[in-house]
Amino acid sequence: MAEEQAYHVNKGLECIKALRARPLDPLVVEEALAAWVETSEGQTLDRMSSDEAEADHQDISKPCFPAAGPGKSSMSRCHDQGLRGSNSCDEELGAFIGDSSMHSTEVQHYHVYDHSGEKVEGVEDADSILVQSGADDGVEVWGGDEESENSDVDSGEPDPEGSAPADWGSSPISPATRASDVETVEGDEIQKLLEDQSRIRKMTKAGKTLVVPPIPSQERPTASEKPIKKGTDVKSTSSGTMAESSSTGGATRPALKSQWGPSGPNASAENALASASNVSPTQGSKTESGTTTSRISQSNIEPEDDYDDELFSDIQDIKTALAKLHDDQQIIITRLESLLSLKGEIDSIKKQISKQNISISTIEGHLSSFMIAIPGFGKDPNDPTADVDINPDLRPIIGRDSGRALAEVLKKPASERQSKDTGKLGIESKGLLKKEFQLKPIEKKSSSAIRFVPDGSVASRSVIRSIIKSSHLGEDRKDYLMSLLNDIQGSKDLAQFHQMLVKILKN
């Protein structure tokens, strides 16, 4: 048993070290801790039920040695002084006390003897004294119904032979209790680690975190805390209380007959069980206690199932909200892309407008340099349009007086050019123009826009070279003609060469 305890302790310490080196997720640890609590509660109830069953069916005829407390001694007399002395009894008692590894959970039975070594008569009830080992607070003694009346042994009288009165000390702790202490310490360490881990996370995370609600407590509700309502077939409702049964086995207690008559439709009670006043203990107490334990553990699991369902629903709500946010984000991105396309179109329109502004400014510059001369003189005074003013919208474009340009090229002013005969207006106008503004007649012997007349100038030679280069003649003939042109001297020879070249090109 000691080896098993040491094994469990070592495993617990290894688990604690591993948890300190690599902390687990708080949710996983809480689930493991809840499962461990349910398992430990089930094991404790199983041990209690097994101890009670063993105490009921144990043969109490086996004698056991008493356990002496620390620092005190207990003396017992042997049954036969002739064969067994007090020294042998003391040796057996000392051997029992020295063996600290022997711890029995069985029921102990004691015989009462007088000082002479004879068994005391009339104390049959003393045989039913029971000592429960394994308790921490001491030994509890149960006696028979007539123990205080029939017993002749007085614990307060001193022993005439000088022996000290027997002092029954507390029995050592059972291995099962020690094992549960180790598990309790292990659970406390795990809880401490969880608290430290949560404190560190709260200090490190300053932003928003998802706070998981704590696991609801698994305390059993009392009869006064949770009133419930039960529906019936009629309109009235009856209030009741919800409480768990403390008994693990036995018969159903009889219920008192109600004094009130039924106010609604009757309910069938064919499957109701008959009540029993007395029930003998059965061998299936362990099974019943185990069933009750499983029911209790199942009732403890139900709040955790509700908690898991709530947590699952919260997670689903969060997922739905995230999906909706994703969809909204996609819509926003689509609209932003359309805005970017519109921005490109707007930029192209702005570029076109800037180009048009440049062209308009260029046209305005050209118009500002124009001088449009609108003749305003020489009109018939009887003409109804003679006194009509110029369109005011055209004044910035015209920029000059209507008769200013004409007055500058005439010899006489406009006041002196009034003619009575309208038929002679054109002849008089020609004579009135200044000589330097009059056009000269076209001469046939000089070059003009009508024809080309070569002379001995360099310009004439350049024109002939251009005619030869732009012709459809071959390269050899072009080179030959160019060499002849270079050898020609004088205007007459150049004119003859030009006539010959024209004939060659026409053919």
From Swiss-Prot:
Q: What is this protein called?
A: Phosphoprotein
Sequence ranges of Basic and acidic residues compositional bias: 189-199, 222-233
The species this protein belongs to is Rinderpest virus (strain RBOK)
Q: Where is this region: Interaction with the nucleocapsid (N-RNA)?
A: 459-507
The similarity annotation says: Belongs to the morbillivirus P protein family.
**Keywords (A to Z) from UniProt:** Phosphoprotein, Viral RNA replication
Q: How is it modified after translation?
A: Phosphorylation on serines by host CK2 is necessary for the formation of viral factories.
Q: What does the subunit section of this Swiss-Prot or TrEMBL entry state?
A: Homotetramer. Interacts (via multimerization domain) with polymerase L; this interaction forms the polymerase L-P complex. Interacts (via N-terminus) with N0 (via Ncore); this interaction allows P to chaperon N0 to avoid N polymerization before encapsidation. Interacts (via C-terminus) with N-RNA template; this interaction positions the polymerase on the template for both transcription and replication.
| TM regions (residue ranges) | none
